[in-house]
Amino acid sequence: TRCSVVRGLGDVYKRQDTDSLTDTDSKFSASTDYYGFLDADESAWYGSQQQGVIKSVVQLGIMNGYTDGTFHPIGNITLSEAIKMAAVVHATCNNQTISFSASDGGKWYDAYLNYCVKNRIVSSDEYSSLDAYATRAQIAHIFAKATSDFAVVNDIDYDYIPDVSERSEYADEILALYRAGILTGDERTRAFRPSDTITRAEAAAIISRVALPTTRIKIV
């Protein structure tokens, strides 16, 4: 069953054009045209001439740019932004609606946080500040909880990832995403760098592989 992308409050969408993004194995369908961004180099690894991950997540309505026409591909993702994206992914795959009400409070992300808490993606007191930059491990944890569509394409264990062990925080989620071909780690060392922050382009790569199974990567 294909799901329609749920559009959240405050997101900016352009005219529909769904012809340029197809994945018969995906639960997602494209709903937004892609025109590029002023600061996104289409010849870079994330660009439409290479992996095209920013284009994919924008077309699917999971991520969007800023009103000044930029995307900030090398800017870091905050926890609140990650929670918003996880809520959209989960709602899309489960045919649910993210509801907005005055009781949500004054922060733009409150409805998304409430949705994620209700659906056990995160707990209400899991993070001390949602304005903090998300780590790579936290991103793995959040998106592993947002969807369960993780068919194994890489038969690997913890010994494949040099800086993650069974005792590492969010170890199970990190390994699950490696095994699913959603995470690949450093091309040379295979390291995941779980404590590092993550850029918007890197997050787009993870999210596009979550949404589009045919883009997942077999590494062994």
Which residues are covered by each model-predicted region?
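A short amphipathic alpha-helical interaction element
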Residues: 54-57, 86, 116, 174-178
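Non-catalytic cell-wall polysaccharide-engagement segments
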Residues: 200-202, 207
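Structural detector for helix-capping/boundary residues
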Residues: 7-10, 80, 137, 201
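Alpha-helical membrane segments in multi-pass integral membrane proteins
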Residues: 169-179, 204
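Feature responds to low-complexity, polar/acidic, surface-exposed segments characteristic
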Residues: 15-49, 64-83, 87-137, 145-172, ...
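Single conserved hydrophobic/aromatic residue that forms the stacking wall/gate
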Residues: 1-16
